[in-house]
């Protein structure tokens, strides 16, 4: 497990490119026949990917000890979105099939989780976030039809996109985890611009569906002290509450966002005026 400590905004603005990447960028999300796990001290989020190709993947028996509990989700909830082929997920004996760009919410207390692909030639790619949880809510699949779709932006401002909200209160009950998927239209390359921060929440972006020869310049930092990270396909970035989070790609792309913190109000944002950015 990769552990990332919290970084103060005053410290962050002194970091060079290498250190910024080390502190905030998660370069490897998917590894065939393995799971990855990054544990951030910021709001205690866990981020990772599960990619079963041949056979079944389960979390290691000792993973609970790293969280001071008996098993991973003893005091946690988990949300995942599949960006690969269809997956079979067995949770405490109950089987779920999760298709491409479908989500699964797993409630606190789920003990035995097993992940496999229905077709090894088209392996599942299960991107997940996990947050501390205080209550038990039912495990359930969220399909694309279940998700709330919201068009945003405009071709004229190069930010036309569709937000698909999977784990939000209007769709599924969670303790504090929100997740969704945003896809940019062809010809658009800016996400979340005009930008914002969340004083009351942190967020993680996971960029995917990028052509091999394309990159994204992900903007971060305080509004008056912005920095950038160059990112490639299927990489994630941790965004503290004090940081803006926006990006521009050399071609259109998609990304999954996950938030945890004080509330589940999607629109609870602190908007930043364009003229105030530095």
Swiss-Prot record:
Signal peptide: none annotated. SUPFAM superfamilies: RmlC-like cupins (SSF51182). It is an enzyme of class 5 (isomerase). One of its GO terms (molecular function) is zinc ion binding. Zn(2+) binds at residues 196, 198, 203, 245. It comes from the Bacteria. The keyword Metal-binding applies. Its EC number is 5.3.1.17. NCBIfam families: PRK00924.1. This is 4-deoxy-L-threo-5-hexosulose-uronate ketol-isomerase. The gene is kduI.
